[in-house]
Amino acid sequence: MAEITKADVISFIEKMSVLELAEMVKELEEKFGVSAAAPVAVAAVAGPAAAEAAEEKTEFDVILKAAGANKIGVIKVVRALTSLGLKEAKDLVDGAPQPLKTGVSKEEAEEAKKQLVEAGAEVEIK
């Protein structure tokens, strides 16, 4: 069996359409649990402006860090919170750390965290 070189891969990718490339990137992100988004450097804001920016945060992300010992219980809570199917919820829990809910209110994020922690999960709110 011939070995595939980087040049072969690049040649193959060059022939793909933009839509095919976008789908491939999405599949690679899901397969390897990474994001293709470039990191964004943000300049530090000094003084009161920084405090105001921190206080104004209205959208939060609930990140499932780890399932803990009660994986089945965590999967049940994930299904209830996200309305995912059993396989999708299990894949999400198995792939931790993963974002569970994004852009939700502080109250909703805290409630989701409470339910997940009660089920034995390790959760972070960003």
Curated annotation (Swiss-Prot):
Subunit (UniProt): Homodimer. Part of the ribosomal stalk of the 50S ribosomal subunit. Forms a multimeric L10(L12)X complex, where L10 forms an elongated spine to which 2 to 4 L12 dimers bind in a sequential fashion. Binds GTP-bound translation factors.
Gene Ontology biological process terms from the UniProt entry: translation
Record's keyword terms, sorted: Ribonucleoprotein, Ribosomal protein
Transmembrane segments: none
Coiled coil spans: none
Organism for this UniProt entry: Geotalea daltonii (strain DSM 22248 / JCM 15807 / FRC-32)
One Gene Ontology MF term: mRNA binding
Name of protein: Large ribosomal subunit protein bL12
HAMAP family named in the record: Ribosomal_bL12
GO cellular component terms given for this protein: cytosolic large ribosomal subunit
Keyword Magnesium: no
Functional note: Forms part of the ribosomal stalk which helps the ribosome interact with GTP-bound translation factors. Is thus essential for accurate translation.
